Amino acid sequence: MARLDAVLWDMDGTLLDSEKLWDMALRELAGQYGRELTGAVRHALIGASGPNAFRILFDGLGIEHTLEAVEEAAEWMEARVTELFQGPVPWRPGARETLDLVRAAGVPMALVTNTKRSLAEYGLDTIGREYFGATVCADEVPHGKPAPDVYLRAAELLGVVPGHAVAIEDSPTGSIAAQAAGCALLVVPCEVPVPDAPGRTFRDSLVGLELTHLEDLVRVHANS
């Protein structure tokens, strides 16, 4: 019988209420081009990373995305988000309690994020590195989410089979990545709705989540 061998956590919007910080920086960046960030463009950016994120942004703003423009925007965004990540970042409801619950049960955990390592470290300052046996960032694998690379690498580092791990995500992009890696999936939407699909279990928040819920997800996933 399949057992729960690991929990793999997304960071932005799942553990930390940090999407608002990204939103602030993106709106400021759009303003520098004399544009206004629309809700549709913002939603399309949630979970995106690297050059693809800036192509989505520039297309949405109606701006030509030359290589030079993308590089300049990326440098500005990293500097601004670094400023905003200084100091404690708010937690998502129930996230800290669930981390404590899983750790107390002795189940290994990994942080699996599309955020660059340099920025993820600021998030880890708030969360606490002691929770995780591994942390994997998008700039440390060939392809970020929605590719499965970050999840496959996290499972490898923990020495677990992806199908015996539960991924906890908040976005469509992250959900696709987790399922492509073969993980059981719990979706707790934050800033943008996540479409229902086979293999996706939804909760409104992490408040009240029990270890048995995660164990059941693995069993159901193994039998699907």
Put a short name on every predicted segment.
Residues 1-43:
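Active-site neighborhood of HAD-like aspartate-dependent phosphohydrolases
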Residues 27-30, 51-65, 123, 155:
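Helix-loop "lid/cap" segments that line or gate small-molecule binding pockets
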Residues 35-37, 63, 129, 159-160:
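Helix N-cap/coil-helix junction residues
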Residues 58-97, 105:
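Metal-dependent phosphoesterase signature
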Residues 14, 113-115:
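Conserved phosphate-coupling serine/threonine residues in phosphotransfer and NTP-handling enzymes
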Residues 23, 27, 50-55, 74, ...:
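An amphipathic alpha-helix signature
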Residues 1-5, 96, 100-103, 116-117, ...:
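Asp-based, Mg2+/Mn2+-dependent phosphohydrolase catalytic module
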